[in-house]
Curated annotation (Swiss-Prot):
Accessory subunit of the mitochondrial membrane respiratory chain NADH dehydrogenase (Complex I), that is believed not to be involved in catalysis. Complex I functions in the transfer of electrons from NADH to the respiratory chain. The immediate electron acceptor for the enzyme is believed to be ubiquinone. Belongs to the complex I NDUFS4 subunit family. Keywords: Electron transport, Membrane, Mitochondrion, Mitochondrion inner membrane, Phosphoprotein, Respiratory chain, Transit peptide, Transport. Residues 1-42 form a transit peptide. The keyword Amino-acid biosynthesis does not apply. The gene is Ndufs4. It is found in: Mitochondrion inner membrane. It comes from Mus musculus (Mouse). Pfam families: NDUS4. GO terms for cellular component: mitochondrial inner membrane; mitochondrion; respiratory chain complex I. The modification Phosphoserine is found at residue 173. This is NADH dehydrogenase [ubiquinone] iron-sulfur protein 4, mitochondrial.
Length: 175
């Protein structure tokens, strides 16, 4: 209703009182859901706005970030795909590439006994959909990196009939 009152007040200011009366009548005849922005119009606008901007020259972002130079120049990251969880049979979280930072100096907090660090990036893990994206991000920030290639498990061929083979000890007698 706020959008309706704003448009009516704008029409009143621009066209005078007579336009106000006709606008109020036309607003009353239009269902309220037609006044809201429909989802297909938003989706149409989003497809037009997804063009990428490419920059040919490499930009130095160190002055913009505010991160101390010791955290930028001497930083080493590890780019990898995490292994499958051994406790489950699913392969969730093994499709994305992760970037993990090296561990810096840690010390024990004398008051609480917690492990403390002065490194703001040590506990951060970044996720990327492609290895090339992670490498480009590391190069853009000036970090050296190690890439651990994705290990694809070799499928083992198994057959149901092998469970009942006469020359294999799959079933042990109890006597």
């Amino acid at each position: 209703m706020a959008a309706v009152s704003i448009s009516v007040s704008l029409r009143q200011a621009m066209l005078g009182r007579r336009a106000m009366a006709t606008a109020a009548v036309s607003v009353c005849r239009v269902p309220s859901r037609l006044l809201s922005t429909s989802t297909w119009k938003l989706a149409d606008n989003q497809t037009r706005d997804t063009q990428l901007i490419t920059v040919d020259e490499k930009l130095d972002i160190t002055t913009l970030t505010g991160v101390p130079e010791e955290h930028i120049k001497t930083r080493k990251v590890r780019i990898f795909v995490p292994a499958r969880n051994n406790m489950q049979s699913g392969v969730n979280n093994t499709k994305k590439w992760k970037m993990e930072f090296d561990t810096r100096e840690r010390w024990e907090n004398p008051l609480m006994g917690w492990a403390s660090t002065a490194d703001p990036l040590s506990n951060m893990v970044l996720t990327f959909s492609a290895k090339e994206d992670a490498i480009a991000f590391a190069e853009k920030n000036g970090w050296s990196y190690d890439v651990e290639e994705k290990k694809v498990p070799k499928p083992k061929s198994k057959s149901y009939g092998a469970n009942f083979s006469w020359n294999k000890r799959t079933r042990v007698s109890t006597k």
